[in-house]
Curated annotation (Swiss-Prot):
Binding positions for Mn(2+) 2 per the UniProt entry: 294, 296
PANTHER family in the record: PHOSPHORIBOSYLAMINE--GLYCINE LIGASE (PTHR43472), PHOSPHORIBOSYLAMINE--GLYCINE LIGASE, CHLOROPLASTIC (PTHR43472:SF1)
Residues annotated to bind Mg(2+) 2: 294, 296
Pathway the protein takes part in: Purine metabolism; IMP biosynthesis via de novo pathway; N(1)-(5-phospho-D-ribosyl)glycinamide from 5-phospho-alpha-D-ribose 1-diphosphate: step 2/2
Sorted UniProt keywords: ATP-binding, Ligase, Magnesium, Manganese, Metal-binding, Nucleotide-binding, Purine biosynthesis
Catalysed reactions listed for this entry: 5-phospho-beta-D-ribosylamine + glycine + ATP = N(1)-(5-phospho-beta-D-ribosyl)glycinamide + ADP + phosphate + H(+)
Enzyme kind, highest EC tier: ligase
Binding residue positions for Mn(2+) 1: 282, 294
Official protein name in the record: Phosphoribosylamine--glycine ligase
Source species of the chain: Methanococcus vannielii (strain ATCC 35089 / DSM 1224 / JCM 13029 / OCM 148 / SB)
Cofactor: Mg(2+); Mn(2+)
Length: 443
C-alpha cells in the first residue's frame, strides 16, 4: 500500500508512525528537511519545498500512491489537495477553498456570522490602517474589552498578538496593526477581535465531508516559558487525560464545543464544498461557554503527538474513511490513557532562535524512560543533527495516570544536549490545578 506523506515536522513524524503500524504501508515522503524519524520510516523521500505544486505532482506521478496525506497547512493553502484529488489519488486534507477555515481568518469569522454558529465573538476585518480600524478598537475600549490583532493569513502561529500579553493596551494594538500593514505580515490584511478571557483547550475531529468523529480533548501550552509566561509559540507541549476529557472542562461545555464543530463542517460544505481531513478547533472556555479562537485545517502540533499514539483503530482505515466519505462505517477508538508531550526548542525561540547548531539526542535513554521520540525542525547533515530555528524535537509519555505520563516525558526530555530549552511544568499537578482554579474564578 503506497502512501504519500507531505511534510517533515513532528506532526508528520507522528502521522508516519501511526501509518507504519500497518505493515502493508510503504511510505513515500515529500519534505524540505531531512527529518531522521520520517526518513527512517520512508521507502523513498523527495526533498523539496512542501508548497511546490510542480514537485508534488512530479513525485506523485513517479510513485503512483494509493493514498495521500497532507500534514502542514501551507500545502493546503496552495491547493495540494486539489491537485492530488484531480490526479485520482484519495487524499486526506481539505481542498484550497475548504482549507480557508484556517488560511483565511476573515473567511472563518464571516462563516460563523453568516450561518449563525455559536461560539463567535465581536470582530472586524480591515484591508488598510485607518479611521475605521481605530474607531473599532476605541469602541472595544469603551466596552471595557481588550483586543487581539490577527494577520488574516498564515503566519506559522506567531503573528497573533494579544493585549495584556504581547501588547500593553489597546493603543499598543493600533501600533501593531499599523506594523502588520507596513510589513505585509500574513498577507497585509488583519482581523481585530475582542479578547476572550478563560482557559484554552483544543478539540480535533476526523472529517469525511459529512461526518465528524471526535478525538480526546487536549490542552496545549503556547507560552514559551514555565508558568505560562513569555511570548506565544507554535506550542511548547500538551496533555490529555485518560477519560478523554479535561479536568476544568464540564461535560456539557465539551458537548457545546463539539456542536460548534459539527455546525462548522456543515457550513463549510454549504459555502464552498465538503471538508475531508483533520479539523482542529482551538477554543476558549469562558464564563459564557466555549468560544472558538481559531480553526486549523490539519492536526495540531503538538496535539498529534498526544492523540495518534493512543489511537487503537488502524490509522490507514481512518484515512481512507476520511477520503472516501465512509467514516460512519468505522469504529474509531482511543486507548483510555493519559498523555503528556513536551518540546525542546532552540534558545531564543520564538523571537530570535539560534540556527544551524548541533543538537545531541540520547535516544537510548529516551526509550529507557518509556517515552516516544518525535523529530521536528531538524536537519540531518553529514551524520549530525542540526536545529533549523523552530521547535526541534518532542517526547510523549503515556500512562494510566497523567502524573505518571508527565514523569515519563520529563525523564525523557532531559536527554537532549545543545543550545535548547524546554518547559518542565507541562502536565504537572500544579499547572493543571491552576487551570481549574482559573475557571472557578470566572464562573
Amino acid at each position: 500500500m503506497k502512501v504519500l506523506l507531505i511534510g517533515g515536522g513532528a506532526r508528520e513524524h507522528a502521522i508516519a508512525m501511526a501509518l507504519k503500524k500497518n505493515r502493508s504501508v510503504e511510505l513515500y515522503t515529500l519534505m524540505k528537511n531531512k527529518n531522521p524519524g520520517i526518513y527512517g520510516l520512508s521507502k523513498e523521500v523527495s526533498f523539496n519545498n512542501e508548497t511546490d505544486i510542480d514537485k508534488i505532482k512530479e513525485f506523485a506521478e513517479k510513485i503512483r500512491p494509493e493514498l495521500a496525506i497532507i500534514g502542514p497547512e501551507a500545502p493546503l493553502g496552495v491547493g495540494a489537495a486539489d491537485l492530488l484529488t484531480e490526479m485520482g489519488i484519495p487524499t486526506v486534507g481539505p481542498k484550497k477553498l475548504p482549507a480557508q477555515i484556517e488560511t483565511s481568518k476573515e473567511f472563518m469569522r464571516n462563516l460563523f456570522k453568516k450561518y449563525n454558529i455559536k461560539g463567535s465573538l465581536k470582530y472586524a476585518a480591515f484591508n488598510e490602517y485607518g479611521e475605521n480600524l481605530e474607531k473599532f478598537i476605541d469602541e472595544m475600549t469603551g466596552l471595557g474589552k481588550d483586543v487581539v490583532v490577527k494577520p488574516a493569513g498564515l503566519t506559522g502561529g506567531k503573528g497573533v498578538k494579544v493585549v495584556g500579553e504581547q501588547l500593553k493596551n489597546n493603543d499598543d494594538a493600533k501600533l501593531y496593526a499599523k506594523e502588520v500593514f507596513e510589513k505585509s505580515i500574513g498577507g497585509g490584511k488583519i482581523i481585530v477581535e475582542e479578547k476572550l478571557v478563560g482557559v484554552e483547550f483544543t478539540l480535533h475531529g476526523f472529517v469525511d465531508g459529512e461526518n465528524i468523529v471526535f478525538m480526546p480533548a487536549v490542552q496545549d501550552h503556547p507560552h514559551a516559558y514555565n508558568n505560562d509566561e513569555g511570548p506565544i509559540t507554535g506550542g511548547m507541549g500538551s496533555y490529555s487525560c485518560s477519560n478523554h476529557k479535561l479536568p476544568f472542562l464540564p461535560d456539557d461545555k465539551l458537548d457545546e464545543a463539539k456542536e460548534i464543530m459539527k455546525e462548522t463542517v456543515n457550513a463549510i460544505k454549504a459555502e464552498v464544498g465538503p471538508y475531508n481531513g483533520f479539523l482542529y478547533g482551538q477554543f476558549m472556555l469562558t464564563k459564557d461557554g466555549p468560544k472558538i479562537i481559531e480553526y486549523n485545517a490539519r492536526f495540531g502540533d503538538p496535539e498529534a503527538m498526544n492523540l495518534l499514539p493512543i489511537l487503537k483503530t488502524d490509522f490507514l482505515d481512518v484515512c481512507f474513511g476520511i477520503s472516501n466519505g465512509n467514516l460512519d462505517n468505522i469504529n474509531i477508538e482511543f486507548e483510555n490513557k493519559a498523555t503528556v508531550c513536551k518540546y525542546v526548542v532552540p534558545n531564543g525561540y520564538p523571537i530570535c532562535p539560534v540556527k544551524n547548531k548541533e543538537i545531541l539526542v540520547n535516544s537510548n535513554e529516551i526509550e529507557k524512560a518509556g517515552a516516544i521520540l518525535f523529530y521536528a525542525s531538524v536537519n540531518e547533515e553529514n551524520g549530525k543533527l542540526v536545529i533549523t530555528g523552530s521547535r526541534s524535537a518532542a517526547v510523549t509519555g503515556i500512562s494510566e495516570r497523567i502524573e505518571d505520563a508527565e514523569k515519563i516525558a520529563q525523564d525523557a526530555i532531559i536527554n537532549f544536549e545543545g543550545e535548547i530549552f524546554f518547559r518542565s511544568d507541562i502536565g504537572t499537578k500544579k499547572l493543571i490545578e491552576k487551570r481549574i482554579e482559573r475557571m472557578k474564578e470566572l464562573i
